[in-house]
């Protein structure tokens, strides 16, 4: 096999590869041998028919097509290690070809075959000055209100209840049966038995809860309410309703007092007083907020990078398909733990409801792939503009992490040009994104 030409175009880098007659015959003979294994002919045992005789008695066009497929797969692996490819590697954004086709496949008698393989390139376009990337200001400092709300939640988690032989009050939890009617007809979803309801929680519509104040265990009452005009059930919007309610139990809720004894009961390390507890909460909330803010900045930056790609930029469909296939495989692994045929996957996930189709899934993942590629293109441009590169230490760190997680030797990763290059690209993308995020974060906080 040899590369006979390299064409560097706007969107693609294309390589023409010739297979020698000897190499092509290796692929073809292998397919002929497969096809002749079960060939029965007088004078020969099955699988022992000479190739030249077998060729006249098997479906040669099928063997030819299968040989082309095998040759194409082998070339896709082979080309990545060639010097001509490596020279162009930094311009190529995906090492899976967007097109891979034989040039002279119309004649099964051909003694040699050539292929053209095209790879998607990083497009060139202008990106904003980093200082001009603007995102909305984000609250990044924990305040007193946040701490107070966290304390209220913790106190509520430790509430206790006790049954009371008295009339219900706001903040009591009552256990009730209820059945609802609209125009004297019971409606779906309007009935429950032994339901726990905190009076004043506003979890029921209108003033339903307030109308139960004053009732005791054993009392019955018709509660009249009106459904909101924007209620989520269409046939109940704005309707007047009557609920037949029976009260079984009235529970008084006792909220613990925030004092040193309560704090000690939480068994927090080195936290024994209210003051220490508030400091502890503030620190924990700040950690959570830092994570939330970081995610918000990342999301906003992702959107901004996406917008920078010119709207008229054409992304090769083959490139989109390659990324979409990866996304679909990842989705399969995350949901069912393995990669299966896409039709089988859709059937498993949809369960026969018809909400998800193969076409819909592919289109959704292709849209995600386009968004992903746009960001990848923008990051590549910023790596040039800001002169950001990855050091050997950056790559070594990534390799060590991958080797540890995949039980693969570091040496094997380094010796595989495709894998090594992919790691290098991911490390660069990560470094550029972190740089941009840090710059944007200064203005956002």
UniProtKB/Swiss-Prot annotation:
<keyword id="KW-0697">Rotamase</keyword>
<keyword id="KW-0143">Chaperone</keyword>
<dbReference type="GO" id="GO:0005737">
    <property type="term" value="C:cytoplasm"/>
</dbReference>
<dbReference type="InterPro" id="IPR027304">
    <property type="entry name" value="Trigger_fact/SurA_dom_sf"/>
</dbReference>
<dbReference type="InterPro" id="IPR008881">
    <property type="entry name" value="Trigger_fac_ribosome-bd_bac"/>
</dbReference>
<dbReference type="InterPro" id="IPR036611">
    <property type="entry name" value="Trigger_fac_ribosome-bd_sf"/>
</dbReference>
<dbReference type="InterPro" id="IPR046357">
    <property type="entry name" value="PPIase_dom_sf"/>
</dbReference>
<dbReference type="Pfam" id="PF00254">
    <property type="entry name" value="FKBP_C"/>
</dbReference>
<dbReference type="InterPro" id="IPR037041">
    <property type="entry name" value="Trigger_fac_C_sf"/>
</dbReference>
<feature type="domain" description="PPIase FKBP-type">
    <location>
        <begin position="171"/>
        <end position="256"/>
    </location>
</feature>
<dbReference type="GO" id="GO:0006457">
    <property type="term" value="P:protein folding"/>
</dbReference>
<keyword id="KW-0131">Cell cycle</keyword>
<comment type="similarity">
    <text>Belongs to the FKBP-type PPIase family. Tig subfamily.</text>
</comment>
<comment type="function">
    <text>Involved in protein export. Acts as a chaperone by maintaining the newly synthesized protein in an open conformation. Functions as a peptidyl-prolyl cis-trans isomerase.</text>
</comment>
<dbReference type="InterPro" id="IPR001179">
    <property type="entry name" value="PPIase_FKBP_dom"/>
</dbReference>
<dbReference type="Pfam" id="PF05698">
    <property type="entry name" value="Trigger_C"/>
</dbReference>
<dbReference type="GO" id="GO:0015031">
    <property type="term" value="P:protein transport"/>
</dbReference>
<dbReference type="GO" id="GO:0003755">
    <property type="term" value="F:peptidyl-prolyl cis-trans isomerase activity"/>
</dbReference>
<protein>
    <recommendedName>
        <fullName>Trigger factor</fullName>
        <ecNumber>5.2.1.8</ecNumber>
    </recommendedName>
</protein>
<keyword id="KW-0413">Isomerase</keyword>
<dbReference type="InterPro" id="IPR005215">
    <property type="entry name" value="Trig_fac"/>
</dbReference>
<keyword id="KW-0963">Cytoplasm</keyword>
<dbReference type="GO" id="GO:0051301">
    <property type="term" value="P:cell division"/>
</dbReference>
<dbReference type="InterPro" id="IPR008880">
    <property type="entry name" value="Trigger_fac_C"/>
</dbReference>
<keyword id="KW-0132">Cell division</keyword>
<dbReference type="Pfam" id="PF05697">
    <property type="entry name" value="Trigger_N"/>
</dbReference>
